[in-house]
A protein has these predicted regions:
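Active-site/pore-lining binding-face segments in mid-to-C-terminal subdomains
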Residues: 188-280
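GST superfamily/GST-like fold recognition
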Residues: 175-195
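A non-catalytic, amphipathic alpha-helix used as a structural packing/dimerization or gating element
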Residues: 75-83, 153-160, 164, 211-214
């Protein structure tokens, strides 16, 4: 949903194809994940396919300059890049946890997801797919971080994010001005299942953040939202307090995990162990998330000294300083 929303908002012509459907003519992706973007050649085939939403967004910015989702202020753009990763690599853990750690949520997804690519799937095959989906996804919980011990950490983080969004959306439509950025679409993408699909987190959101639920519906298709060239971005110094509050949340959860995970990957360790939200957090090391931290540090290194100082001023006191520490 994240990338489809980006394409819609940016008015980029595209065909959206359900993977595994009879219309799926995409070649194999480099790794079996979604979304996959494919660029057609002159003969109707594909000259290139690409996975991973963050590099996809960067590539689209190069190919299509209109209705950009990258702020003109480099310091703001960097903070936006960080919050995009917070959603993609931390909030995703809560999404996975709520869906596959609760019986009601698990059963709903197990019954419905097999029908996504084929509404006419025979009942016996749907039943087999139901069991396969549940067994596979529940079996991956520990790899994602959704253990019984970590569950309360993920749930409290989700609740605080909802509370922050409820306060933020009382005054602002987006995180960095009057137009959406990378992080807006990333939070939308991870929140969509929790706000509109899975029963347990949806009930929490109805109680705590009704504004976030309706914002999420907006974000799905912002093709109607008007923007004027490169106008509408705030400077790093003018980032709303509620946007900064998301950085504070990241500083108590996402940031210590990302740093510990990168260290565990570098050391070849079998487990990540760190303190998040005042509680011990453990999970299997994740090589991709170590790469994400390296990307953040590369982006920071590419800023001018002046813009690095401005970023430091925003991150100072949030706990996210460790992301760019050398």
């Amino acid at each position: 949903r994240k990338m489809r929303a980006v394409l819609r908002y940016r008015h980029i012509p595209h065909d959206w194809i359900v993977r595994g459907s009879t219309h799926d003519d995409l070649p194999p992706a480099p790794v079996p994940v979604i979304p996959v973007l494919g660029w057609r050649d002159d003969e109707g085939g594909y000259r290139e396919v690409m996975v991973d939403s963050s590099p996809q967004i960067t590539r689209l910015e190069t190919d299509h300059p209109q209705r950009s989702i990258v702020a003109t202020d480099p310091a703001t753009a960097f903070i936006d890049f960080v919050l995009e990763d917070v959603a993609d690599e931390w909030l995703s853990k809560a999404m996975y946890h709520y869906r596959w750690a609760n019986a009601e949520d698990t059963e709903k997804s197990g019954r419905l997801l097999p029908l996504d690519a084929n509404l006419q799937l025979p009942a016996d095959k749907a039943a087999m797919a139901h069991d396969f989906f549940i067994d596979r996804q529940v079996g991956r919980r520990a790899m994602i971080g959704s253990t019984d011990a970590n569950g309360p950490v993920l749930e409290r983080s989700y609740e605080r994010i909802l509370d922050t969004l409820q306060a933020h959306l009382a005054e602002h439509n987006f995180f960095f001005g009057t137009r959406p950025g990378r992080a807006d679409f990333a939070f939308f993408g991870q929140l969509m299942p929790m706000l509109w699909w899975d029963p347990t987190p949806t009930a929490v959101a109805v109680e705590r953040a009704p504004r976030a639920i309706m914002w999420n519906q907006w974000m799905d298709d912002l093709s109607w939202w008007r923007v004027d060239d490169d106008e509408g971005w705030c400077s790093a110094e003018a980032i709303p307090p509620t946007t900064r509050a998301l950085l504070v949340e990241a500083g108590r959860t996402y940031a210590p995990f990302m740093v510990a995970n990168a260290a565990a990957v570098a050391a070849g360790a079998d487990e990540v162990a760190c303190e998040t939200d005042g509680t011990e957090y453990r999970q299997t090391p994740f090589k991709y998330q170590a790469k994400c931290l390296a990307w953040i540090r590369d982006e920071y290194a590419g800023l001018s000294d002046a813009d690095q100082a401005r970023v430091d001023g925003v991150l100072g006191g949030t706990g996210c300083e460790v992301l760019v520490a050398t």
